[in-house]
Regions:
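N-terminal non-catalytic structural scaffold regions of very large proteins
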Residues: 5, 10-284
Length: 284
């Protein structure tokens, strides 16, 4: 449904005042109106009239995040908005941020129509992204997860696992996870691998020697893409409510199984977001 156009202030767009004047004074000559139009023309090179494209794009995603706080939406719909925010943020870094970084690397920095240089835009975006991520996790942990728990939907952390659930997760790891994961040791002969875009990975600090007698202080464990990130606990294990466990929690719990004879000193999960702002070359 079409809505009535919003009125803009005189200092933002003087041309509208001319239109209004012509409507109330139809006998005004075209020559006089054209002269007034030229004297009131906007300087299109003035950066005040432009919004930075990347910042505007990110502001849109902030509006998506705000919908996750809107109590007028159903609970699962609010959770869905939180997921959309994450998906949009991935795409934003793949396309927009990668484009800005490419400009920095080229050394040919030029300000945009808004007057901001790529380095300035990146600094602003990084500050705003940190604040948005803090807000995202606050909404998840303080609002959505407690509300879901009241509806008997639980996302179980490792410290919440019962003995029965612990035994089930160990069986799931042995049968489903262990056979499809190949850890990657990092040493001078094995540099950092090219990981799949947006895949879940773990980087580990190790102590001791592997089965071949080699010392490897670092290793990467890529999570299998064939398995779901969220695993539903069977009813015969937990009959009440709907209970879920993250695949990352299971891997983290049993990650030492990949390195017999070695001690895992640290285990941290990470993702790599790659540049997807590709340029098409002309084929002659």
């Amino acid at each position: 449904m079409d809505s009535e156009p919003k009125k803009m202030s005189k200092d933002r767009l003087p041309k509208l005042e001319l239109v209004k004047d012509l409507e109330t004074n139809p006998d005004r000559s075209y020559k006089n109106s054209q002269s007034q139009l030229q004297s009131e023309d906007i300087d299109l090179n003035d950066s005040r009239y432009y919004e930075n494209r990347e910042l505007s794009h990110f502001k849109f995603n902030l509006r998506v995040l705000s919908q996750a706080k809107n109590l007028n939406h159903p609970l699962l719909e609010r959770l869905r908005f939180l997921l959309i925010f994450s998906s949009n943020l991935d795409e934003f870094f793949e396309i927009r941020i990668s484009g800005l970084k490419k400009q920095l690397e080229s050394g040919r920095q030029r300000p945009g129509p808004d007057g901001k240089f790529p380095e300035q835009v990146l600094k602003i975006i990084h500050e705003q992204v940190r604040e948005a991520l803090d807000e995202q996790y606050r909404i998840l942990n303080e609002d959505l997860l407690p509300d879901l728990a009241r509806e008997h939907i639980h996302f179980l952390q490792r410290h919440e696992w019962s003995k029965n659930l612990q035994a089930w997760t160990k069986s799931y790891f042995t049968d489903e996870v262990l056979p499809v994961i190949s850890p990657l040791g990092l040493d001078p002969a094995h540099p950092f691998p090219r990981l799949v875009n947006k895949s879940l990975n773990f980087i580990l600090t190790l102590e001791g020697k592997d089965a071949f007698g080699r010392e490897s202080g670092l290793a990467i464990v890529p999570a299998p893409r064939a398995l779901p990130r969220l695993i539903k606990v069977p009813r015969d294990i937990m009959p009440e409510g709907d209970n879920f466990i993250f695949l990352s929690s299971i891997i983290h719990e049993y990650v030492e199984e990949f390195f017999p004879g070695m001690t895992v000193k640290g285990c941290h999960q990470f993702r790599v977001t790659r540049n997807s702002n590709l340029e098409m070359s002309k084929v002659e």
